Amino acid sequence: MKNLLGSSVKDLENVALEYGQAAFRGRQIHNWIYNYRNKKKSIDQIEALPLDFRKKLKDDGFKLSELSVQERNLANDGTLKLLLSANDNESIECVGIPTEKRLTACLSSQVGCPMDCKFCATGKEGLKRSLKASEILDQILFIENEMNRKVTNIVFMGMGEPLLNIDDLLVSIRSINKDFQISQRKITVSTVAVPKMINKLSAKSFQILGNCQFTLAISLHASNQKIRETIIPSAKNYEIENIIEDCKQYVRDTGRRVSFEYLMLSGVNDKLEHANELSNLLRGFQCHVNLIQYNQIDEVEFQRTSLKSLQSFQSRLSHNGIAVSLRKSRGLDKNAACGQLRQNANHQ
């Protein structure tokens, strides 16, 4: 299988030359994929190419897509969740989140997830495999084709732990930036935090991308190690203080502030003492806290914190000098919101 999605202009020019074609034929393929964002996903439909060239590419196994739409779910607020099927019959979920001026694509980086966060549906079925860069990028094209508009923002907040698929993650970010023409500053990578991988992310970003301008979002969800271990089992391998130190180094290396995701769970992490503890943990470096309301999933007994507690928590962080905002959930009625994605069509 040779997927052309994610290939650079130079790569595609080389493909053309290998088949005895002029280099500009490679640029025509690139334009077909990225500039036109064409719904025609077969090599033999690239009308700008000579028929015999198209046939040879197809016969030799070249493809523009390895995914197909298995299911569509449109929420009342316009959010679209797609269940995509890969060649190996594994399922991938992605979400298109529209506003008047933006279309945000929430992308998956793995089939399933190994982190087993207790509040998240994705990890309930474990990790099947990591996605190839082409499969990550194809999610953008499917969202664009289904919603008939171009994606403007990217969040890696779908299925999987992005830093456990770091090479394909960064290759896809490079293509999103260079080929899809989406600024790195409009890309967010969310991670539950994996030992040594925050430092590796900044180093490999400079190596593969030449810089590191996307936003790093840490799924912290706790103000101390004890609470974090109860809701995120993998936290036992990565002390919360070490995460913060690695984030401070990340800021020094990249010049970019870090975002911290904080899921408000009633009676677990939503008291004012937790807000004060979180303030002490984060004080003194460039960061921002996103408070997230819990979205109910099956088989989990956590409850959403009250609006009063949420507002008090937000006010306390702000009073303590911590930049904070409340992230609005989208697509709740179709299980397309934060923490609700899973690979099984039976859970729609």
From Swiss-Prot:
This is Probable dual-specificity RNA methyltransferase RlmN. It comes from Prochlorococcus marinus (strain MIT 9215). One of its GO terms (biological process) is tRNA methylation. Belongs to the radical SAM superfamily. RlmN family. The keyword Acetylation does not apply. It catalyses: adenosine(2503) in 23S rRNA + 2 reduced [2Fe-2S]-[ferredoxin] + 2 S-adenosyl-L-methionine = 2-methyladenosine(2503) in 23S rRNA + 5'-deoxyadenosine + L-methionine + 2 oxidized [2Fe-2S]-[ferredoxin] + S-adenosyl-L-homocysteine; adenosine(37) in tRNA + 2 reduced [2Fe-2S]-[ferredoxin] + 2 S-adenosyl-L-methionine = 2-methyladenosine(37) in tRNA + 5'-deoxyadenosine + L-methionine + 2 oxidized [2Fe-2S]-[ferredoxin] + S-adenosyl-L-homocysteine. The active site is at E93, C338. S-adenosyl-L-methionine binds at G160, E161, S190, S219, L220, H221, N295.
